[in-house]
């Protein structure tokens, strides 16, 4: 028995944008504007995927992608998307993504006026950081004082933790998949992470759809691949909770601070959680035995011999079924 995060995230990075950009390419590929693409095509597709796996969307927004042109972000549209997200029990975050090579600090300084006018009462708590080299800048940026968690792309090395503290008060959540690509090794890695942490963080970056460079970047192809991968490869993990990125942040903080002890005697497992203020989750592997009863919490089946334990009190008692007696067979010549 060991603690897990119990959080499954679906993050849509660089969606939506609010400026009329790349219009010639949009007309050529989609026969409509970027605004119409985001509203009329992409949003219904995202909702269909989200509802199929009962996910909670986190959309990382940006006022614009190109800070080098003269196209300014449109007014009056942020409230529309915030309303849509609220209806789907999702949330919005900020994105550092852009196509003009604008640094994080400069971008956030330019964006601040827009957000204060268009979403004055909305508390953005998350940031999608397209370039992890700018992590230090993100932690020091005054415009990002309210950010509690930072999302980055998948780690390219094995020594970087999936979840951690980026600073004293800010957590870091690395992507565990991009939604579009899913190889055999990707699947193996995802299963390992789910077994160890009860956690996934699919970060689907839609910048390519707004600024397609090749045929496979078109939304029709991107969405088909992503819908297949996300809906298929999340199926084995339905026992875990679907969360927004800020809810995941809360659970990560609880997970990283957790102190517990466990012992077993006969068919009883005793679990003690120090200073439990909210729920905490554990994975219990029982082999061939079954969990029959629990006091101080609840359990659900992940797969045969594996249970997700929700500790609701400091002391949790779990009763397992009696172990079946092994039958020995002897053969005589």
Model-derived features: positions:
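C-terminal beta-strand-rich structural cap/linker in extracellular carbohydrate-active enzymes
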Residues: 303-333
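His/Asp/Glu-enriched short active-site or ligand-binding loop at hydrolase and phosphoryl-transfer sites
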Residues: 143-181
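Solvent-exposed beta-hairpin/edge-strand motifs
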Residues: 283-297
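Surface beta-strand/loop "capping" patches
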Residues: 242-287
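Catalytic grooves of carbohydrate-active enzymes
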Residues: 1-20, 45-50, 118, 129-134, ...
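Metal-dependent polysaccharide deacetylase catalytic core of the NodB/CE4 family, i.e.
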Residues: 16-20, 44-145, 158, 201, ...
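The substrate-binding groove and active-site-proximal loops of carbohydrate-active enzymes
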Residues: 27-39, 61-72, 97-102, 130, ...
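Small-residue (G/S/T/A) turn/hinge positions that recur once per unit in extracellular repeat modules
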Residues: 90, 257-260, 295-301
């Amino acid at each position: 028995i060991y603690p897990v995060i119990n959080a499954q995230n679906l993050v849509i990075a660089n969606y939506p944008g609010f400026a009329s950009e790349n219009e010639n390419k949009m007309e050529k590929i989609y026969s409509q504007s970027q605004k119409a693409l985001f509203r009329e095509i992409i949003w219904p597709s995202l909702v269909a995927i989200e509802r199929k796996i009962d996910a909670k969307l986190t959309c990382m927004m940006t006022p614009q992608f190109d800070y080098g042109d003269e196209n300014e972000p449109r007014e009056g549209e942020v409230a529309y998307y915030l309303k849509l997200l609220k209806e789907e029990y999702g949330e919005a975050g900020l994105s550092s993504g852009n196509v003009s090579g604008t640094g994080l600090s400069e971008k956030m300084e330019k964006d601040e006026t827009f957000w204060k006018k268009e979403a004055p009462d909305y508390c953005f708590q998350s940031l999608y950081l397209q370039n992890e080299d700018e992590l230090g800048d993100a932690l020091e940026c005054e415009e990002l004082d309210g950010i509690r968690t930072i999302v980055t792309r998948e780690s390219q090395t094995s020594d970087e933790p999936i979840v951690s503290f980026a600073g004293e008060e800010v957590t870091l959540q690395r992507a565990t998949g991009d939604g579009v690509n899913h190889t055999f090794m990707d699947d193996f890695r995802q299963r390992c992470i789910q077994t160890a942490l009860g956690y996934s963080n699919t970060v689907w970056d839609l910048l390519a759809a707004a600024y397609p460079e090749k045929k496979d970047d078109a939304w029709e192809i991107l969405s088909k691949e992503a819908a297949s991968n996300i809906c298929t490869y999340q199926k084995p993990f339905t026992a875990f909770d679907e969360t927004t990125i800020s809810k995941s942040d809360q659970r990560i903080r609880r997970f990283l601070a957790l102190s517990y002890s466990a012992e077993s005697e006969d068919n009883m497992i005793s679990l003690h959680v120090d200073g439990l203020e909210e729920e905490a989750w554990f994975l219990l592997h029982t082999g061939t035995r079954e969990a029959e009863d629990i006091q101080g919490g609840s359990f659900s089946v992940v797969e045969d011999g594996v249970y997700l334990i929700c500790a609701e009190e400091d002391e949790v008692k779990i009763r397992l079924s009696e172990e079946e007696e092994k039958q020995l067979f002897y053969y005589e010549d």
